[in-house]
A protein has these predicted regions:
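ATP-binding N-lobe of GHMP and related small-molecule kinases
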Residues: 1-102, 106, 119-128, 133, ...
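Solvent-exposed alpha-helices and their adjacent loops that cap or buttress functional pockets
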Residues: 34, 158-159, 165-168, 184-189, ...
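Short, basic/glycine-rich phosphate-binding loops at helix/coil junctions
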Residues: 50-66, 114, 156-158, 272-282
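Glycine/serine-rich anion-binding loops at beta->alpha junctions
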Residues: 66, 93-122, 161-162, 312-327
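DPxDG-like acidic metal-binding loop motif
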Residues: 73, 102-127, 145-150, 157, ...
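Conserved, helical-rich catalytic subdomain that frames metal- and/or nucleotide-binding sites
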Residues: 169-313, 328-331, 338-341, 345-369
Length: 369
């Protein structure tokens, strides 16, 4: 019977970017937060160890989704089979509901969902739970290797893509280096979220090139950026440990405030109580907003600064073009949705209402069948 797995979206609660490194990559510091919003990935697999046959077939309801080895779900399944020395005939179908290349980590989440589905289809998930399992067990004779231990799964996920490992944790997650070094943080309690998807494309490689030019213009060296990211990591750790970082409410360097003012009260969110939303920001906004002014305006509408329904936090997610706002109540979120109904600077925006997802809920809700 096919296995259906929810493939949840993520947003970034702040994203610090370092100067370009010698290897061409950039060090990052961010907090990922998973959402209820999801694709559905269906996996069908048959063990073909005896026949020594292996095949992967991928389909989707969205023609923009690659149906070959370029797809992260395909890569994840192929790497898992190779690493375990296993053989299987695998079919993957991605029911695409999340934006493609929108900054929500959809492709990376698809990869983890495909791995979870593959494990269940071939019975690897049951074997991994067996405390008596060893590398010399009979399962090893069937090509099922040691990679199913959590640390190995994270290594394989990182080999597929920078954002992939976070989806093996879920909830609220600290991401370091290129984003592939991940650590679970205490979950924020669920809050309402509006995801705004504009009909505007943002090229991530181009955004990084613009960032590199900005670093050069401002004289940000590799050493200075390393210090910047270390300080940001410590600040995140303090905030999620219940300490309030120093620094007051201010507009981000992109010029658009990320939250709407003093929301203190007996039912305040931990996002406000820790003070984290008063200082975190997404560095990509500094280079993306000047190129796409409509995105800055969408963030302004989501934040609704100075109003009773102001967001707890609003930001670009990843390099965009998707933006999001977090809200204390459903009513506040619905008002934000209403503000997105008309085109913004000539750009149509699709607004979606969802909620943030704790780690427990993430795993409890993942497998549908």
């Amino acid at each position: 019977m096919p296995t259906k797995v929810r493939s949840h979206a993520k947003v970034n609660l702040g994203l610090g970017i370092g100067a370009p490194r010698a290897d061409g990559f950039h060090a990052l510091t961010t907090v990922y937060q998973t959402l209820e919003l999801h694709d559905v990935v269906t996996v069908t697999a048959r063990n073909t160890w005896k026949e020594k046959k292996q095949s992967i077939r991928l389909t989707s309801n969205d023609e923009r989704v690659p149906a070959d080895g370029r797809n992260t779900a395909w890569k994840m399944v192929e790497l898992a089979l190779q690493d375990g020395g296993s053989y299987a005939e695998v079919e993957i179908h991605i029911d695409k509901r999340l934006p493609v290349q929108g900054g929500l980590g959809a492709g990376s989440a698809n990869a983890v969902a495909a791995l979870i589905g593959l494990e269940r289809e071939l019975g690897w998930n049951k074997q991994r739970r067996d405390p008596g399992w060893t590398a010399q067990s009979p399962w090893k004779e069937m090509g099922i290797g040691t990679f199913y231990w959590p640390s190995r799964r994270l290594e394989l996920a990182a080999a597929v893509g920078s954002d992939v490992p976070l989806f093996l944790i879920g909830g609220t997650v600290l991401g370091l280096d290129r984003g592939q070094e991940v650590y679970p943080l205490p979950d924020i309690e669920p809050v309402w979220c509006v995801v705004a998807t504009p009909e505007v494309g943002v090229s991530t490689p181009q955004a990084f090139r613009e960032w590199d030019a900005l670093c050069a213009a401002e004289g940000l060296t590799a050493e200075a950026s390393t210090d910047k990211l270390k300080k940001l990591s410590r600040a995140y750790a303090c905030a999620f440990a219940g300490e309030t970082p120093r620094g007051g409410h201010k507009a981000g360097s992109s010029g658009v405030p990320t939250l709407g003012g003093d929301r203190a009260g007996p039912q305040e969110s931990a996002l406000v109580r820790t003070g984290i939303t008063s200082w975190i920001e997404n560095d990509f906004e500094r280079v993306v907003f000047p190129q796409h002014p409509s995105l800055a305006e969408i963030k302004r509408l989501l934040a609704a600064s100075g109003t009773p329904e102001a967001a707890l936090y609003a930001s670009l997610s990843g390099s965009g073009s998707t933006l999001f706002g977090l809200y204390q109540t459903r009513g506040d979120a619905e008002k934000a949705l209403a503000r997105l109904e008309k085109p913004i600077e000539g750009v149509s925006v699709r607004g979606t209402l969802t909620r943030t997802l704790t780690r427990k809920a993430y795993w409890d809700e993942m497998v549908l069948t």
